[in-house]
């Protein structure tokens, strides 16, 4: 997968002067694949599958037209790419699904055939990994679920919120956590595709129902939501805008919170995500010193006003 992305990125550079829009779109598509590879085996498998299917459709159209004419590949404007951090998570999800599926550096039918064949091989490898159950990132979360902090003074499990990004990872984690805890009713999932009313009901259940222990969500579902009954949070994926890590934690560490809140961030070392996260920690430490250790108390007040 890394080699595929590297090769495509090298080819992308050729579009620097010829077609800046295509360069941006293909570069964005490859960045999405890298992020989904880091997210979960399910996310990268489904992304590769969708990309392969979309490019196969383009290949069929190109063969019929014999000149590659047909449906234009999806694009995202330069302005959208520059201001991606300002978009809501459900809008970003839509961009990702459209762009990652179809943007390609292929300029001829032969090049498109080669890329489709490469994707078939990568898709098969991703499926093998998914079926193998070998997922280091999930193993880290599995260990967190065993920590003493997961239990309250009364011996019952405390409520946990898990933030991720791709919907494929949301469902993947739901299945994993249900199997781990042994009770389907103890896990709920919310995302941008869930209606606002249904989200409200799920959050209300999470706040009131002792049997609902784990809420898995993405930022689209979490915006404006008060999750103060949860005291434990895991960032399974970093958001596009790393500053949203602070916002996520502010959903449980609100003004009036009497429990100590704990946050785990699952980030691989020696990656772009890891570098961004390290810089964010430096910013948070500077803010903590400036605010006398009340950085998340202040964030909690801000989100109390927005909710």
Segments the model singles out, each with a brief description of its role:
Residues 184-218:
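Conserved helicase ATPase core of P-loop NTP-dependent helicases/translocases
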Residues 171-174, 215-231, 249-257:
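SF2 helicase motor core recognition
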Residues 225-238, 262-265:
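A short beta-strand element within the Helicase C-terminal
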Residues 1-121, 306-307:
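Inter-lobe connector of SF1/SF2 helicase motors
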Residues 47-56, 164-191:
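Conserved helicase motor "Helicase C" RecA-like lobe of SF1/SF2 P-loop NTPases
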Residues 4-6, 10-17, 21-22, 132-165, ...:
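Conserved interdomain hinge at the start of the Helicase C-terminal
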Residues 259-307:
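C-terminal accessory region of SF2 helicases/translocases
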Residues 241-263, 280:
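Conserved SF2 helicase motif VI
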């Amino acid at each position: 997968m890394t080699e595929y992305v590297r090769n495509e990125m090298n080819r992308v550079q050729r579009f620097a002067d010829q077609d800046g829009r295509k360069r941006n779109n293909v570069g964005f598509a490859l960045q999405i694949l890298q992020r989904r590879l880091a997210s979960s085996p399910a996310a990268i498998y489904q992304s590769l599958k969708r990309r392969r299917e979309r490019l196969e459709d383009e290949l069929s159209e190109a063969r019929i037209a014999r000149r590659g004419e047909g449906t234009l590949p999806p694009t995202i404007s330069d302005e959208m790419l520059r201001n991606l951090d300002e978009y809501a998570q459900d809008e970003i999800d839509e961009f990702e699904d459209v762009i990652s599926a179809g943007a390609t550096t292929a300029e001829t039918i032969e090049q498109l055939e080669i890329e489709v064949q490469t994707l078939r091989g990568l898709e098969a490898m991703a499926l093998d990994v998914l079926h193998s159950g070998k997922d280091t990132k999930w193993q880290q979360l599995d260990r967190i679920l065993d920590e003493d902090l997961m239990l309250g003074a009364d011996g019952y499990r405390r409520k946990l919120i898990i933030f991720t990004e791709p919907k494929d990872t949301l469902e993947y984690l739901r299945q994993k956590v249900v199997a781990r805890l042994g009770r389907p009713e103890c896990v709920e999932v919310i995302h941008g595709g869930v209606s606002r009313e249904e989200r409200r009901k799920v959050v209300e259940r999470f706040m009131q129902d002792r049997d609902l222990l784990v809420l898995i969500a993405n930022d689209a579902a979490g915006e404006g939501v008060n999750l103060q009954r949860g005291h434990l949070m895991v960032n399974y994926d970093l958001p596009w805008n790393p500053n949203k890590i602070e916002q996520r934690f502010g959903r449980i560490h609100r003004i009036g919170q009497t429990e100590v809140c704990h946050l785990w961030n699952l980030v691989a070392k020696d990656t772009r995500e890891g570098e961004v996260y390290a810089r964010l920690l430096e910013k948070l430490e500077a803010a903590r010193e400036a605010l006398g250790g009340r950085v998340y108390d202040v964030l909690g007040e801000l989100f109390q006003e927005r909710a």
